[in-house]
């Protein structure tokens, strides 16, 4: 017969665990909102910067433009910037982005191209360190909601590697946010820049809302308007000098957007994982409660049978 006290203790333990997972789900949900607000707050600057660069490059694309960040050279070494999380308890978030990085490594090796890793996040750093992969630089302990200063320091390192010709291309591997239950690891080329790479596309904004007592995601496509410069516009400075000053800002902004997307994906994955854990805990509590009631009923029945048997013996 099952021990009633052991079952009661386990029910209480599962209830305590459920309280923890539910609290973690709510915290992750609040941080997803903050991540979204940060993306929206940085959008006006990002849109204006992309618009200026787009028009300048189109104005100069038939001229003699020679800028280091636009230089296309033979690719011998690629820097792979892998963005992961510092912690677990977020489902397969870290596993998927690491798997995509390994897939990209194999693709480069098949082409005879060397690679160097720049890991952002403790999970990717630990994984590739154990496998003695060629890690150039590591960044751990960043804010859960990325800041412009953090993105700027990483961007400076990437620019230094590219301009010194230590690497010939820089690729960012991060997790793009799709929905609360879906994300997609992607590879984006940061350097060198091309005119096509600066083309402005419609962007999607996700908003976390509450409907019928449940958290949901609303997606909105925002068409970004591109205004053209007048053909007779006169620049006080040489347009090439303007480009040379703005391109590093654009790289910084692109990296920040990637880090923000990755942070939102991690938080959404953690929220989903904790929600599933809470649901599983509820089901386990129900199963244990049923077992407890059956065991208690069996114990009472056994006691009644013993009383009746004793009375009959008299």
UniProtKB/Swiss-Prot annotation:
CDD domains attached to this UniProt entry: F1-ATPase_gamma (cd12151)
Major place of residence? membrane
Keyword hit for Coiled coil: no
Record's subcellular location: Cellular thylakoid membrane
Could you give a GO molecular-function term held by this entry?
ATP binding
Please state the span of the N-terminal signal peptide per the UniProt entry. Answer: none
Matching entries from SUPFAM superfamilies are given as: ATP synthase (F1-ATPase), gamma subunit (SSF52943)
Q: Which GO terms describe its cellular component?
A: plasma membrane-derived thylakoid membrane; proton-transporting ATP synthase complex
Q: Which InterPro entries match?
A: ATP_synth_F1_ATPase_gsu, ATP_synth_F1_gsu
The topology of this chain with respect to the membrane is: Peripheral membrane protein
Which keywords are on file for this protein? ATP synthesis, CF(1), Hydrogen ion transport, Ion transport, Membrane, Thylakoid, Transport
Q: Which family does it belong to?
A: Belongs to the ATPase gamma chain family.
Q: What is the annotated quaternary arrangement, including any partners? A: F-type ATPases have 2 components, CF(1) - the catalytic core - and CF(0) - the membrane proton channel. CF(1) has five subunits: alpha(3), beta(3), gamma(1), delta(1), epsilon(1). CF(0) has three main subunits: a, b and c.
Tell me the function of this protein.
Answer: Produces ATP from ADP in the presence of a proton gradient across the membrane. The gamma chain is believed to be important in regulating ATPase activity and the flow of protons through the CF(0) complex.
Protein's recorded name: ATP synthase gamma chain
Organism this protein belongs to: Rippkaea orientalis (strain PCC 8801 / RF-1) (Cyanothece sp. (strain PCC 8801))
What gene, per UniProt, encodes this protein?
atpG
């Amino acid at each position: 017969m099952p021990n009633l006290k052991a079952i009661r203790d386990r029910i209480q333990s599962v209830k305590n665990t459920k309280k923890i997972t539910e609290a973690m789900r709510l915290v992750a949900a609040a941080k997803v909102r903050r991540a979204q607000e940060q993306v929206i707050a940085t959008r006006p600057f990002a849109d204006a910067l992309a618009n200026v660069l787009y028009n300048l490059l189109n104005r100069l694309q038939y001229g003699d433009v020679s800028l280091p960040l636009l230089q296309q050279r033979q690719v011998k070494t690629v820097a792979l910037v892998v963005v992961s999380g510092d912690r677990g308890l977020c489902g397969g978030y870290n596993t998927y982005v690491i798997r995509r990085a390994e897939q990209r490594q194999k693709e480069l090796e098949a082409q005879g191209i060397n690679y160097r890793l720049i890991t952002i996040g403790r999970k990717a750093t630990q994984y590739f360190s154990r496998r003695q992969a060629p890690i150039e630089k590591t960044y751990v302990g960043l804010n859960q909601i990325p800041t412009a200063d953090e993105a700027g320091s990483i961007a400076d390192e990437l620019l230094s590697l590219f301009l010194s010709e230590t690497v010939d291309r820089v690729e960012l591997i991060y997790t793009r946010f799709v929905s609360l239950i879906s994300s997609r690891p992607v590879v984006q080329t940061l350097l060198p820049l091309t005119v096509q790479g600066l083309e402005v596309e419609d962007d999607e904004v996700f908003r976390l809302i509450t409907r019928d007592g449940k958290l949901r995601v609303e997606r909105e496509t925002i068409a970004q308007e591109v205004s053209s410069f007048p053909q007779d516009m006169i620049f006080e400075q040489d347009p090439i000098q303007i480009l040379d000053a703005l391109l590093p800002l654009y790289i910084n902004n692109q990296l920040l957007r990637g880090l923000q997307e990755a942070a939102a994906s991690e938080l959404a994955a953690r929220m989903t994982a904790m929600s599933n854990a809470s649901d599983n805990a509820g089901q386990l509590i129900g199963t244990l409660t049923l077992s407890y009631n059956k065991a208690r009923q069996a114990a009472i029945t056994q006691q009644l049978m013993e009383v009746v048997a004793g009375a009959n013996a008299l």
